[in-house]
Amino acid sequence: DPEYVNVGFGWRGHFDQQPPAVPTKDNHVGSYRRIIDIPANWDGKQVVVHFGSVTSNIYLYVNGKFAGYAEDSKVAAEFDITPYLKKGKNLIAFQTFRWCDGSWDEDQDFWRLSGVARESYLFARDAQLHLEDIRVTPDLVNNYKDGVLNISAKVKGTGKLNFILFDKEGKQVTTATGLAKNGTANITMNVENPHKWNAETPYLYTLQVSLSSALKNGNMKSASMTPVKVGFRKVEIKNKQFLVNGQPVLIKGANRHEMD
């Protein structure tokens, strides 16, 4: 069966296609396992395992117990494995199959390589207060002169959010704060005449997102700090013309296959 096709499925001619079923013959499996030590200072925290990219799916086991399943070859998968861990050594194992039912949706002009393609790692966070997700959407206003950051932060627990924007040289540009209560906090940051991002000068700022909670004595306890790279740009289509920051751009290109 081909590892690359630009038309049709990789199993064509060898399988009576009946979605969402996939072939059992030649549906090869990769098995991975690693013994790890959980640091002592992670005790009491939520431990999450992150897989940047696994093709085509992943069955995860921790210390012999099933801990989760995911499928989507180019989207990260994260699992809370706290309930399955013990003190000392822990066995993390997972299997990934060449095809799954999601492979029907991934029929593209692409190399069909199975396995682990991006970084995999563990991280720990406060179980009661942590940043679950963040979306930063940049925009340009005032005839593409000034910048706006529309920030949506999803938080577990109740805490204070602090946002600090730094330029490429590490100089503080602007700040904002917000209060998150078991849900989503929406913040808008305005930046006067920022460096603009484009293909020729891809200037990036760093948005530092800090989450903290108040102690009984009135002091603040830091729960997490997350850096996010952001660039100020505006992409539009006007009068059948593709524009970046108000300037027309002609795009020429082809697929980039993620092989590295």
Model-derived features: where do they sit?
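Active-site-adjacent substrate/metal-binding segments within catalytic domains
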Residues: 8-38, 42-50, 55-62, 68-71, ...
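Accessory beta-strand-rich segments of carbohydrate-active enzymes
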Residues: 22, 27-132, 157-158, 162, ...
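Short glycine/proline/serine/threonine-rich loop/turn segments at secondary-structure transition edges
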Residues: 42-45, 85-89, 191-204
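Beta-strand-rich binding/interaction modules
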Residues: 60-62, 146-178, 185-187
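Aromatic sugar-binding surface patches on proteins
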Residues: 75-77, 182-191
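Extracellular recognition modules
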Residues: 93-95, 206-210
